[in-house]
Design a protein with these regions (language model features):
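Conserved, structured core segments of small domains
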Residues: 1-118
Length: 118
């Protein structure tokens, strides 16, 4: 089976325990952990550079427009995204086991879905 493209979206519950733990830390503790996290993410990216199709990046504040044209600010779980290639959906999901965004930063999951038609 040829490799397919998969969108990976890291999630973070901004009311959950990992978020609360992060924000309970001092600025110095957050900075130290962020430095370790960035180095670990860079190492993960380097180790997986052959399967990363689009590096993606962090996602900022969200605005939503509904079918009536009303625009509003919303809070969602979406935090970071990237596109990878893998032989199967399960293989794509398993790529993110123990990813630094979950083991060091306060992300609590990764939603992985095929990019249809890619």
């Amino acid at each position: 089976m040829p490799d397919a493209a998969y969108l990976a979206v890291f999630t973070m519950d901004k009311t959950g325990p990992k978020w609360r733990d992060w924000h309970a830390r001092t600025e110095a503790e957050q900075a130290e952990r962020a430095d370790r996290g960035v180095a670990a993410v860079n190492a993960w990216n380097a180790a997986h550079r052959d399967i990363i199709l689009h590096q993606g990046g962090p996602l900022g504040p969200t605005r939503r427009i509904d079918d009536a044209g009303a625009v509003s600010d919303v809070v969602n779980l979406l935090t970071v995204f990237m596109v990878v290639k893998a032989a199967s959906h399960d293989e794509a999901a398993r790529l993110f086991e123990d990813h630094p965004h979950m083991s060091i930063f306060p992300c609590d999951g990764v939603e992985v879905m095929p990019v249809l038609g890619a």
